[in-house]
């Protein structure tokens, strides 16, 4: 994750590692360019591979289909929110039309990076995928626009800084 401070893991990674350790399981950490080697060095395949969403496609091409595979974002969607609601929201992407309004909401007020996933990457991906111009608004720190009904899609971060009840 390019937003990660040099020499540090981001909070979702730390929380997942803590959960793995608390459950007496093992965690192996590898960068995307070392994953193939790390998997080859194991005596048996891992129970699960977890990746950063920004390299999902790259990692998917490395991980054998027999190994379950997910992202930190999907884990946090299940842990902090209602995955069924999120899946239904993803279906709304197929119905997006020119100039539809999309809200991207983040639980915290972190400093945005030049290649920020919420303000740069997700809007770019959605425009590429739908092939139409879309209108984006952003909210952070739990402050939302008054009229949420005007948005055709609301995308929320993984909520690593929030409690589940705050997300629901």
Where are these regions (language model features)?
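C-terminal-of-GTPase-core extension/linker across diverse P-loop GTPases
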Residues: 1-118, 125-127, 140-153, 161-168
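Extended, compositionally biased non-globular segments
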Residues: 136-138
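Short beta-strand/loop segments at the ligand-binding rim of alpha/beta enzyme cores
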Residues: 131-134
């Amino acid at each position: 994750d390019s937003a990660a401070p040099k020499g540090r893991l981001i909070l979702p990674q730390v929380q997942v590692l803590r959960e793995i350790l608390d459950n007496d399981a093992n965690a192996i950490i590898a960068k995307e360019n070392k994953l193939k080697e790390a998997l080859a060095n194991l005596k048996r395949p891992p129970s699960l591979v977890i990746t950063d969403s920004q390299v999902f496609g790259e990692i998917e091409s490395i991980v054998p289909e027999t190994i379950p595979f997910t992202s930190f974002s999907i884990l946090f969607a299940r842990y902090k929110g209602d995955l069924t609601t999120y899946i239904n929201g993803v279906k709304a992407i197929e119905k997006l039309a020119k100039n539809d309004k999309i809200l991207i909401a983040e639980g915290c007020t972190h400093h945005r990076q030049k290649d920020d996933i919420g303000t740069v990457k997700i809007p770019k991906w959605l425009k590429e995928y739908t092939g139409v111009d879309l209108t984006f608004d952003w909210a952070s720190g739990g402050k939302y626009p008054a009229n949420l009904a005007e948005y055709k899609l609301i995308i929320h971060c993984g909520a690593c800084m929030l409690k589940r009840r705050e997300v629901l």
